[in-house]
Amino acid sequence: MWRIWRCRLSFLFATGCLLGALTAGLGSQMSDSVGRNVQAPAGVADASQEAGDVVEERTERTEEQAFALGPPRRHSSESLFPRNASVTARRRRNRRIALIATAVGVAVILAAVYVLRRRRAQRPQDPEPPAPRSVEDPEVLPEEDEASSSLPPPPPPSPPPPPPVEDPLSPESQTVDLSCLSGTTVRFFGPSHHFGGFTPLYDPAPDKRVATVDAGANALFIGGGGLNGQFAKTLLEEAEKHGIRLTPEELSQHSQRIQQSLLRRAVKSPGKLVELDTGVASPVFARSFGFVPVVPGLMWEESEVGPNVGVTFVHILKPEVTPYGNLNNNVMMYTVAPSGAAPDKTYSLAYKTTIAGVIGAAAAYNDTPAGQQYPVQGLRLPLLGGGIFRRNRSLESIGRANAEGTSLAITRYGPNFELQYMYDPSNAALHGLQEAESTYLASMLD
């Protein structure tokens, strides 16, 4: 910094000196030029000798007048050159300008010398390095790398978009604790604002991990109509959102192939959960499990109740097809209910086996390492067999079979889940459980 100031002051000093010299020379040159520009009268400038004689004659006259008596005789330069008033005024003005310019040059030089001396007297000293801060100083923080300090901080991650919200459930839904189910909490949904009051398969923001049960087909595929078709629609919509190319036919064939493979494994170990790692080969299932409480067709004729009745599958959905992207919605269950055309005793046995398969499969999954870490806490299910499988069977009889099968399954596998029944205009499940609760309480009084 001092070097820069010294260079600036040296340049100012030199400029002042040059300006003073130029202004002084300019004044002298202007005076001379004025003298040269004055023209002598005609006859005088042509003969320098005659001009000299005139001067000598004037000198002699002056001496004579000095010693002569009487008043002195006035004379002027008019005897040599006639006086010009404009030339005289111009000469005086130029002399003033020359004097002023000279004074300005001298002032600039003096100012430069004064500033130079003042700067030299106040020359700053190099600052001393700051003393190192104590380690005990609470404000001492670790220094950041130069590379990281030069870069701007990364922008905060944008918040995730809010999940789409479905129509709220009806306030008519109710929750009860039933003693006949060992205190299991049962929730009955009222009609929603969907067409026909249909209960959504999954909630946008569930407070627990709920597995929704699909009332599947005897051929073990996902698709078609009813609740099975609704599951296919949900999976296909989620896949499309994430750029997964999947057609209804491909989903139907893929799910059928996986579930048939699981069934072949499950019938070899009744009452045990079997697993099939589908993460690589499946576009929708990360892991899949199969469970049968008894071998299908062993205790009844499949020609009466239908094939594959009582088998249950548990599918862990991949994040790309999980409804609303919420991990509490990544469990799907699949079962096959008996045909309502079967005889009453056969139907009752097959129906109880189906309910036992659903609750038993969920309980067995919770016993696995993955289930222990992240267990299923609720089952959302329809009135199984109350759709196209009902045939001529009354809904009341289906409701009673559901209550009996649920009570037996909870007694066997434990009250580990909240049961959530989808909306049913007939309230057959509710009435069947209320009847079972009354019978149970009456038996406790005896």
Swiss-Prot record:
Stretch forming the signal peptide:
1-20
Composition bias type Pro residues, residue spans = 151-166
**Entry comment on modification after translation:** Phosphorylated.
Upon deletion of the gene, what happens?
Deletion of the whole MAF1 locus (which includes all a and b paralogs) causes a loss in tachyzoite parasitophorous vacuole association with host mitochondria (HMA) upon host infection without causing any significant growth defect to the parasite. Prevents the formation of SPOTs (structures positive for outer mitochondrial membrane (OMM)). Partially impairs the reduction in mitochondrial protein abundance caused by infection; specifically, prevents the loss of MFN1, MFN2 and MIRO2 proteins.
Q: Where is this region: Disordered?
A: 43-87, 120-176
Residue ranges under compositional bias (Basic and acidic residues)?
55-64
Q: What does this protein do?
A: During host cell infection by tachyzoites, required for tethering the parasitophorous vacuole to the host mitochondria. This process, known as host mitochondrial association (HMA), induces the formation of SPOTs (structures positive for outer mitochondrial membrane (OMM)), a cellular response to OMM stress, which leads to the constitutive shedding of OMM vesicles containing proteins such as mitofusins MFN1 and MFN2, which normally restrict parasite growth.
Q: By what name is this protein known?
A: Mitochondrial association factor 1 form b1
Organism of origin is: Toxoplasma gondii
